[in-house]
């Protein structure tokens, strides 16, 4: 690993860490700020659903736009940084606008922050795929995911620490961190474009259509959303009191982060699609076992395995999206992938808003839904890859 690759990778890890923590701060304080703005509590989940719907649309559009902006080296980074400054400003103003008791102003700022923050979802990954060489790409992508995993592990602790804090300081710190980090996007783009070897042109035929890939991503993302957000806490509560959940929920993300280093090697050796398929298959087994683990120790082992499997799925999916989009459509493919992540999150919140997760007749089905989704994704991917191999052979 060269020093430039290491520095750019650490930069992307920090960018993802700060961005994900900003979203965590938003989730923690949204109910209180919305109440101050005069918005009924019953609207909270629907605001979050609307946020994810905005991501579904904006992520794909922003990714496609990034493809066009990146045709001239050095043009994309500064523009993304400028958009992020507007995003950080809207985010910063949320706790100051809430006491004005204007629901419209609060919702407008929320919308502005959500739609502009799409600049930090697909486009940075597109930069990695467009400019990073074959050797550097897994390292940088792995560090990018490591930042995401660290934020996921910290989130439960932040929820407890910040629950009763003044919202203005966390919002200010998060806004400044995101804005300052994003401002260096031009530096990252320039170094990626000049310090790494040119990316080889792909073969004329892709391993599978982008549409099929997005179906696979949607299945794995829905499995993750239901498992981590709806199933994990009830599984732990079979063995521990609710007060211990803050220490146990990060176990999934510990497995996620521990998998990063070996996955960097596995991606290089076996390729993105095989790692994605293996991650989905292992994840299906892990989450299925978690539903019937007979002790806390076995449940922790299952959660660690599920976290490592989700890391393999995301790592493989990121590389697969870049490969399917090359050359010239990396942003379109990665934007579509992030749209599917947002779509799955929207479905999960919709389940909660409509109380489907409380329906006793559906709870058993929901418990097995993550395993079914991940197994279906693995099976579909293997079938498509075999069909491609047979056609080529």
State where each predicted segment sits.
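Intracellular juxtamembrane helix-capping segments at the cytosolic ends
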Residues: 119-132, 312-326
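A late C-terminal transmembrane helix in Major Facilitator Superfamily
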Residues: 327-359
